[in-house]
A protein has these predicted regions:
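Short boundary/loop segments of OB/S1/cold-shock single-stranded nucleic-acid-binding domains
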Residues: 196-197, 209-217, 394
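Conserved P-loop NTPase nucleotide-binding/switch module
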Residues: 86-100, 105-149
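A contiguous, basic/glycine-rich beta-loop/short-helix subdomain that forms a polymer-engagement track
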Residues: 203, 215-220, 499
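Canonical P-loop GTPase G-domain recognition
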Residues: 123, 133-193
């Protein structure tokens, strides 16, 4: 197949703007999936966590055969926390499909990926989706998209982008809102006409950049990437050029292409093809698979540096080992090492203590996804509060800042502006939306946002929408206010007693219900005041042998707050840890015994 018959394109979309639905429809209508049974809903989200949260974490490839052309669609993570993934993906494609909701317009999360795509000189195609929705305003959204591109420094050619109006759910697209349409033909044709075929010479020496790494239990490590030049065959001897310019020889055992979403074995591939190669044991992302006789490296892709760091401890609570399968230092270390083989933007460092590791990533979500995956795999561990990575630039301390966008009902905007102001945020823009809500933009230190999401949802009665995105490093602003409330800490090991919890309810809100296993030093609730209170949730009612006059008081327990991983990580202070097991999320003090905590809090 000559490279003229291939189109490689990345799809960029905000959470819930209909990316996966659109890809499902493109697959169905092109007939690519005829050989497959019913398309499972949302075919592109393959990881259980992605389907559940509706976000894309790992980029995936889909191939669509349209007429005599193969269209490779690569999914991009919409979140800046996965910036490492994004940049490598965009290096494989020649155009981008930006999918925008006809009502919400371009969102901050897509801004990050779009800016990277424009900087690489890729030409965008804008698809305005959900035009059948009530309250949609496609024309205003096209204008907003144009303004976004202009603000991101797009060239005149990039600003002259084609616009396709679509309803992915109903399976139609059109170039003009007045037209009638019942299929996606005009979208296929726009991709064919606007996206250039991949450059590359099939007759030149082989060059292919390792874009993502995957693992298969049967064939081992799989390298995914686009063949930049030359050809690659099964059984061919190749050379890997590592980042330090050292070289290593391997033999290709299998080449896999994509048909729809399925990997299929192919005998060979040439310049322009996006493929998976097996048989290469040691290669890192960004390194080059090259011709054995004439190995020439491609430029290594620079990945954004981490901005947040956290400690992972081996779980040493009194309940350690009762709920998980993997609990030892070695098992945790092996799992973290496996993660950084494929998750390039993540760093893992050993610390002075044998059972504590330091992990650094692009944001709370980036690290949170790894912890949630480990929890589902059966790991037990404890993690510390996230801290930002502070840099010294020209002798001055600098910390990461994020651009924050909030959409709130007008009645809550004062509270939000005040709360974020206390956290070091500066307001940069305020506009009224058509539906009566207000969109406010801020620049805020990343530190100020840790722990803010749940407070924001409480302040806006669950109606507000908050997005934040790494912006740049800026001046360090000193101490920021911490949590307003203290916590209730258990003084005993045992099972919680309903009567004791009932008596403690007037002191604050509980994280635990009756008959739950507790231990000394475990945080069981939020104190209504700003100090920590050590309490006994295990004490039963004193019973006397003299019958009391009157009835027993009825015990009426308030439903406890359910802790999720994100909420717990946001909530804790520096002297606390989140204990994570496959069945439970608990909060505990670093030092479980009260006299140890008192000693640690005394000034030296």
């Amino acid at each position: 197949m000559s490279t003229r018959k291939i189109r490689n394109i990345a799809i960029i979309a905000h959470v819930d703007h209909g990316k996966t639905t659109l890809v499902d429809e493109l697959l169905k209508q092109s007939g690519t999936l005829e050989g497959r049974k019913e398309v499972s809903e949302r075919v592109m989200d393959s990881n259980a966590l992605e389907k559940e949260r509706g976000i894309t974490i790992l980029a995936k490839n889909t191939s669509i055969q349209y007429k005599d052309t193969l269209i490779n669609i690569v999914d991009t993570p919409g979140h800046a926390d996965f910036g490492g993934e994004v940049e490598r993906i965009l290096n494989m494609v020649d155009g981008v499909l930006l999918l925008v909701d006809a009502r919400e317009g371009p969102m901050p999360q897509t801004k990050f990926v779009t800016s990277k795509a424009l900087a690489l000189g890729l030409k965008p195609i804008v698809v305005i989706n959900k035009i059948d929705r009530e309250g949609s305003d496609p024309d205003a959204v096209v204008d907003a998209t144009f303004d976004l591109f202009a603000s991101l420094g797009a060239t005149d050619e990039q600003l002259d982008f084609p616009v396709v109006y679509a309803s992915a759910k109903n399976g139609y697209a059109k170039m003009d809102l007045a037209e009638e349409s019942d299929n996606l033909t005009c979208l296929y044709e726009t991709i064919m006409g606007s996206v250039n075929p991949p450059e590359g010479d099939p007759d030149a020496p082989l060059q292919m950049l390792a874009t993502t790494l995957d693992w298969d239990d049967f064939i081992g490590r799989i390298v995914v990437g686009r063949v930049a030049n030359g050809r690659i065959k099964t059984g061919q001897d190749i050379t890997v050029v590592h980042a330090d310019a050292s070289k290593e020889n391997f033999r290709v055992t299998k080449i896999l292409g994509f048909v729809g979403l399925t990997r299929v074995e192919v005998p060979e591939a040439e310049a322009g093809d996006i493929i998976s190669v097996a048989g290469i044991e040691t290669i890192n992302i960004g390194e080059t698979i090259a011709d054995k006789e004439n190995p020439i490296a491609l430029p290594i892709i620079h990945v954004d540096e981490p901005t947040l760091t956290m400690e992972i401890h081996v779980n040493n609570s009194p309940l350690a080992g009762t709920e998980g399968k993997f609990i030892t230092t070695r098992q945790i270390r092996d799992r973290l090492m496996k993660e950084i083989r494929t998750n390039v933007a993540m760093r893992v460092e050993e610390t002075d203590s044998a059972d504590i590791y330091k992990i650094s990533g692009r944001g709370e979500l980036h690290i949170g996804i790894l912890l949630e995956n480990m929890r589902r795999e059966g790991f037990e561990m404890a993690v510390s509060r996230p801290a930002v990575i502070v840099r010294e630039i020209d002798g001055k301390k600098q910390e990461p800042y994020e651009s924050v966008t909030v959409d709130v009902e007008s009645e809550y905007q004062g509270t939000v502006i005040e709360k974020l102001g206390k956290r070091g945020a500066e307001m940069t823009n305020l506009v009224s939306n058509a539906d009566g809500s207000t969109r406010i933009e801020f620049n805020c230190p990343t530190r100020g946002l840790i722990g803010y999401t749940s407070e924001f949802l409480t302040d806006t009665r669950g109606t507000g929408v908050l997005h934040h995105l790494f912006h740049a490093y800026g001046p360090y602003i000193g101490k920021l206010p911490g949590r307003n409330n203290g916590v209730l800490v258990s003084m005993e090991n045992g099972e919680s007693v309903a009567y004791a919890l009932w008596k403690l309810q007037e002191r604050g809100r509980m994280f635990v219900g009756a008959n739950e296993k507790l231990y000394e030093g475990m945080v069981i609730g939020i104190h209504s005041r700003d100090n920590d209170l050590v309490v006994n949730p295990i004490k039963g009612k004193k019973l006397s042998n003299v019958r009391a006059s009157g009835k027993d008081e009825s015990i009426d327990l308030v439903t406890p707050i359910k802790l999720t991983l994100e909420r717990a990580i946001e909530f804790i202070e520096d002297d606390e840890l989140v204990e994570i097991t496959p069945k439970s999320i608990r909060i505990r003090k670093r030092k479980l015994l009260e006299h140890e905590r008192k000693r640690a809090s005394r000034p030296d």
